[in-house]
Amino acid sequence: MDTSATSPDGTQPEMSPAVAAALASADGISDWISKHHPGKVMETRNHRLAAPYFAVCLEYRQAALLLISQNMRASAFALWRPTYENYMRGHWALNVAGDNDFQKIAKTKAVPKFDTVIKALDGKSGMFAKTKAKLWSPMSDFAHGGINLLARWSGPDGIGSNHPDGEVLDLVVRLNAYGLLASMGINYMAGEHGLSESIFVEKVSAVLSGIKALP
């Protein structure tokens, strides 16, 4: 079995112009997020729970983009799920978590399961379970060695990273959306010192206009 299709560290030798352009655009979004990151948020229990989730989402996004820039695509895709999950948990903590949730967290010293979070969010909008159902299987495969990951590391030329550029471009779009949404949550918690939600909605809509379906 030929394993020469990839270098020992799992990287690919070249980056396409399309991926390079997407990363440049993502860097611009990162700079914008950083520029509009409020220094403080209002102190409430919901904000205290939500803020770390949003912050971790932003860090994972940056890490995934860095990995893509180094052509370490499998590692970048492994961060897709936790980036998404931390944003969703932050959204739940900010907008849905109530007295019973905080009492359970204090009693059990554990946060709710992700399915519980999604169900609680669906009580408000009804769309989150459908999104999770569509994305969870490939997300989990890439994070935990499932069939989608194996299919991109085994081919006619041997064993090596073979994540198509199109999938990488879609991942960058998703990462940008999660980052902007997390930043929107942080700005909301800053009250009058944060940017208005409408500004973020416009930017997220512009980002998502180019998205394609991942497998």
Q: Which role does the model predict for each range below?
A:
Residues 54-95:
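Short, hydrophobic, well-ordered secondary-structure elements
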Residues 50, 76, 80, 132-136:
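Short runs of predominantly hydrophobic/aromatic residues within well-ordered alpha helices
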Residues 47, 73, 165:
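Active-site oxyanion-binding pockets that recognize sulfate/phosphate
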Residues 28-67:
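Short, contiguous, well-structured surface segments enriched in hydrophobic/aromatic residues
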Residues 1-44, 100-215:
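Long, charged low-complexity segments
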